[in-house]
Amino acid sequence: MAKTIKKLSPEAGRTDTEGLRAFDADALAKCAADAAQPWWRRRACAQALAGRVPERRVPRLIACIQDAGDVSEVRIALLGLLADRPELLPWLRHEDRQQDGAYGMAEAVLGARGALGDLTAAGALATLAFNPWRHRRETGEEGLDALAARYGFEAVLAELGGARPEDRSTGVRLRHHAGEDVTDALADPDRAVAHRAQEFLTDAERLRGYLAGAPTEEAKLWALYALYRLTDDTAGTRRRYEELGRPRVEVAGLDEELRAAIVHEYGQWAEERTDPRWRIEAVCTQPPPACDPAERLQRAMAALTAAGLAPRPPVSCGEDNRQGDGTYHVIGYGPSGSKVFISTLGRFATDHDDDPDVRRALESAGFRWIDQAVGSIRVTDLGVYYFGSRDPLDVHTLLFYWQD
């Protein structure tokens, strides 16, 4: 039985990619431009056309790209397919493109401008390449790489200047890929730029030399962190940390027990703009004593049972929320569906209602109750991803963290 496009792509998520790549290019182009077809089939056809677009179909495919009423997924796929067509450039550069609110279209337009050699897009591409979302960042980087390949990285950097952090971040990346040393960028005042620079560094001896004369405390800490990443030398890192005076971010109200639990859970893996003092503290300080989560839950259950609160079996926060994961377990109790939360990061417990009976029972069993006053302390300069945000969080959210 002869294959058809419909049989090769019968429904969303079920596409014979290799079969479409071997299919007649003219038929694929016709399907990709056919608004009567499902968008996912049209996109699959566009993707299967890579490197073999029939010239006679190009005007119709371009018309689909330029149709703001068409499905953005299809437009983006077609734009990627035809990103080498210079006749698209005037449309791509038109100010109206900035008003196109279709999801992903603005990024795709910028990427195409980079692919077509539009040096005036360098600034917007640098902004995109500085975005915390990986797919946007990669689009920006690909566009900048295309410009650098065409004009040389010096021309791209000259177009950008260095006033904005995103321009300097692009400079770090392009200079590194051109074989230049970017150790000097560890002293950049923007932590995201300095963080990117340390990721690129691979010469431990050069870092040791830089560390001795780094111009700022943060530059020294970035150098120390990069050196630790390269050598995994915990003892040496701790020795240098002591020599620097054990610098750390002071947070009013954050005691040592809370601090240790938080820094050792989040410090090394925090977001780019996190103060490097948190990262180094996570490496150089002792973690909280090891504990058995199962034993802790058993102790909580026993305390709640002894208090006559009729606790139900504990579940993970992911199970309680029916998705995701995090740093606490949930114990339901009583007839009204009340819940108490037991952190996996230490002996911390809390609930939404500050139930005095629950608090009394758990405190008598050695737990530490996190009330509103303590829970609301914001841990400054420690960026942790949380439902799209990367800003510092409060103690309650960090100890009882859940992400879907």
Model-derived features with residue positions:
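Extended alpha-helical scaffolding segments
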Residues: 220-250
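Short inter-helical turns and helix N-cap capping residues of alpha-solenoid HEAT/ARM repeat scaffolds
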Residues: 36-38, 68-71, 99-102, 132-133, ...
